Amino acid sequence: MNLMKTSLFFRATLTTVAGTLSALAMSTSAYAATFVDTELSLLVDVSSSISTSEFNLQKQGYVDAFNNADLFNNFISKGNIGKIAVNLIYWSSATQQQQSVGWTLIDSVEASQNFANAINATTRPFGGGTVIGSAIDFATPLIFNNEFESNRQVIDVSGDGRSNAVTTAAARDAALAAGVDAINGLVIGNSTSLFNFYNNNVKGGAGSFVLQANTFQDFADTVELKLRREIISEPPTTTPEPATLIGLFGLGAFGITSSLKRNQKQSAKC
C-alpha cells in the first residue's frame, strides 16, 4: 500500500513538473532572455551638494566592491543561477539622469572586475538639484526593457539629500506596482532626519532596507555590505523530500515567477 501511494505521488509530481517546464519552454522560446538571480540598478547621487572629491569617493566605493573577487566568489556565485545583472545611473535634477554603465552580466570574477573598470571610466555628467523620484522613474523602464530575466529586481538609491516626499513616495510606489521587487537606500551622512526620509519615502518592497554611511570615507565599506545584502539569496525555509525533486520544483517555481515577470516586461515594451 505504501509503495502504491509513493508511486502515485511520484507520478503526479513529475506530471506537474513536466507541465510547468513545458510551459516555461514555450514561454522562453517566444522571449529570449538571459536568466540571472537578481537585476540590480544602482542610482548614484551626483547633485551639487556632492563635491568632486565626494563624487570620486562614491565612484571608488563601487569600483572597489566589484573589483573584490570575494563579491562574486562568496555571494553572486552562491545564488541559484550564480549570475546577476547590474547597471549604474547617475542622477540629480528632474531631467538629469544618465545610465553611465549599461546592463551588464556578472557571471565571473572577470566580468565583475570589467564592470568595475567601466564604472572607473565614467565621468560626472551633471550636478544640479536633488530629485530622487525622477531617478526612480528613469530607472524603472530600463529594468523592464533590458535583456535579462530574474526572480528579483532591485533599485538601489544612494544620496546625501532629500527631495519632495510626495513625488519620491509616488515614484517608489509606481515602481513597485510595475513589478520592481525592492527599492533600497544608502544614506550618506549622519543625519537622522535624512535616514528617516529614506526609510519612509524611498525604501519599499519585500526585504528592502536602508543603510547609512556616516561619512563619504565610510561609503566604500557600506557599499560592500549593501551589495552583499542585495545579492545573497535567502536560505529555503523547508527541505522537501526526496532530494531529487528539489531541483525540479525549484526550476518549476523559477519558471512560473519568471514567466510572470517576462509578461510584465513584454507589456512594458508594447
List each language-model region with its residue ranges.
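C-terminal membrane-anchoring or membrane-association module
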Residues: 256-270
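Sec-exported extracytoplasmic/periplasmic mature domains
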Residues: 63-71, 93, 124, 140-148, ...
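Von Willebrand factor
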Residues: 34-100, 102-152, 154-158, 184-195, 218, ...
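Short, threonine-centered small-residue motifs that mark membrane-proximal processing/anchoring sites
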Residues: 7-35, 229-250
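C-terminal "exit" segments of structured domains
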Residues: 19, 206-238
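VWA/integrin I-like adhesion module and closely mimicked acidic/polar interface patches used
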Residues: 161-201
